[in-house]
Amino acid sequence: MASKEATVYVVDLHESMGREMARGHDSKEVTDLNWGLQYIYSEISNKILSGRKTDVVGLVGVHTDTTQNMFEEESGFEHIDIITPIQQFNLDTLLEAKKQLVPNSDNKGDLISGIVVAVQMIKLYTKALKYIRNIVVLTNGQGNMNLGDSGGIIKQLNENRIILKVMGVDFDDEEVDYFEEDKPEHKRENELKLKEFVDRCEDSVFATYKEARDSLDIPKVKAVNPVRAFQGNLVLSDPEQQPPQRVMSIGVEVFPCTRRATAMTASSYAMSKIEPATISTPSQNNLQAVKWDRQYYVNDESGIGGKKELDRDTLENGYRYGSEIVYITKEEEEAIMFPTSASLQVIGFVNKKSVPPYMLMGHTDYIIGQRGNNRDAVAISAFARALFETDNFGLARYVNKDGKDPQIVVLMPYIRAELEGLVFCQLPFAEDERKFILPSLTSLETRSGNKTVTTHSRLLPTKEMLDAMDDYVDAMDLSKLKGEDDEPWLTMEECFNPSIHHIRNVVKECAVSQDYGKIPEPLPILTRFSQPAEELTEEAKPQLELLKHLFDIKEQFREAKKRKTEVTVGQTGLDLDALLEGELEVKLESSQTLSSNVKSEPGRQTASQSSQNSQQLSLDPENICPDFIRTLNKIDTKATSDEEFRSGATNLYKQTITLLEEKLESSKGNDAYNEIIGVLQTMREQADEMEIPDVFTAAKGQFVSKLERGDLGGQKNVLVAQINSI
């Protein structure tokens, strides 16, 4: 269970807090108050997003125009307002408080008295209950500070275990060598007094606001209290078949180690019917939550609309068996379920090199000895060290609760100064692994399968190419980079999920600013690893240039994919393709004469062009996908009308299908299946992009029909099923 926490923010609203200065990455003019409130708004927004009822907040303003606090009748507590009493904040509460957080013209009031009010608020709210108590002070140090009774205040802070955090706007910082220019003398004195006051408080913090503001650019990872997932015995051998002296049993507990974190998800809402003139922004005031209502029907001619509504409780479970449904009662279903009981049983050991890394991508869990039992702690530590010293992993059968499906897990040693135990990760079953037949990168097989080719000038890399690629990989090795203080350039602690934190920051910013038209940019730390390290790319330039030369890499410009309007192209007597290739070729005048002779017969002209396109199309059987895309783009570029483009594309799709049929007939077994599926997927993507899905559907239908008839080497039901899924 999360700890209860109470935080009171004391905000200095002195007139000087309205001073504007250029701040931030964009050097935008902003007041001291608005600059400082960014941290407070962010912290309160995090508490609102967490939704914890036990994480409460209060707000106190100092140097205000009015006086509203529990000590308002006493001297020295004037011009201090409790803007918001301690409570669970929501967006409405925050927006209401935001209206009152503005600099005031009345400079009367005392910051230290504001801290006393905050202490009393926390004492009255938390009483003697177990709470984390915080007071956060935001000031620029130019207001009044009466430290005459500082000893009594410090005693109250320490006795109530209140953590005092003071953030000073433009306070001097010797560690980063920052000193404010032209600082007023009274501000310098206030800084020294305030620092001495904070240093005498236990577990308190005195910092420049810049430190606090910079911390906002570092995403905060949600702290999660561990919840036990399993408690039982780690058993080696079968206690039901072996005598007790041949069975090892260690009392253990299982806790989560890694779990996939997910980003915030949007929910469905409906706009309420409010007059347009009264709607300014789509806030929660004019949004209504959508409720789901599911109804169940069966076809019934005697019912209303030919359907009969059913109650959810009357439905039964069934399993599909072909086109039929096999009905199994609840009693029968319980009988056929695999009976299991909670257990963690070792079934063997393997060398850690025999476990592929890609099998360890799931969530992981810690295994520790039962807390409070030294024997179990020592036993699990010895077991972990034995695995570590022999370079082995353990395999175990794991059932976390009675009746749950069993899992096969791999047990890995986890040895740290603070803990010695095990970490386990679930392994896939045979049905979970997707096995694909992928072509080799270093050799080729002939169509007959009788010969293996290891050298090919165009399809296989040469030794020089492989060596150049090795050099490039070595040049881009991240382990050579060092960050500050010789720390690694890339650490897991700095790898944040951009989607999680960016969505969270956008929601917070839009909620607080109420400006839904301005989306903040992602934090720099979230985009830090979106590009290779600049230092490495500079060092690896020679290796990259060599690769470009050896692989003959050229920049490809994206061509237009579709035409919005039909363009009329005049006869120029020149071949555009020849011009682009540097070859000047004049078209035959006879083609112009033929064009003029058949103007009265458009059908003949279209057929002639289609026939001409048919003769020009040619695809490399060993390089179908790139050639297909290149040819389709050329047809798109040369076509002067949608009809001409569709005709050429249809012809290309037919020829490609014919090529796939030939490849299938000449292959052995299912050797060509993956390549055929890949080509068809490319054809589908290009058809969708060119807005001719019907052309692809027709070509695919022709191919499937031949497969179903067995015209291409017998029945190939597996391939048909894969094609139909495209």
UniProtKB/Swiss-Prot annotation:
GO terms for biological process: DNA recombination; double-strand break repair via nonhomologous end joining; telomere maintenance. It is an enzyme of class 3 (hydrolase). It is found in: Nucleus; Chromosome, Telomere. It comes from the Eukaryota. Single-stranded DNA-dependent ATP-dependent helicase. Involved in non-homologous end joining (NHEJ) DNA double strand break repair. DNA-binding is sequence-independent but has a high affinity to nicks in double-stranded DNA and to the ends of duplex DNA. Binds to naturally occurring chromosomal ends, and therefore provides chromosomal end protection. Required also for telomere recombination to repair telomeric ends in the absence of telomerase. KU70, of the KU70/KU80 heterodimer, binds to the stem loop of TLC1, the RNA component of telomerase. Involved in telomere maintenance. Residues 248-475 form the Ku domain. The gene is KU80. Residues 605-618 have a biased composition (Low complexity). The keyword DNA damage applies. This is ATP-dependent DNA helicase II subunit 2. It catalyses: ATP + H2O = ADP + phosphate + H(+). It comes from Yarrowia lipolytica (strain CLIB 122 / E 150). Transmembrane segments: none annotated.
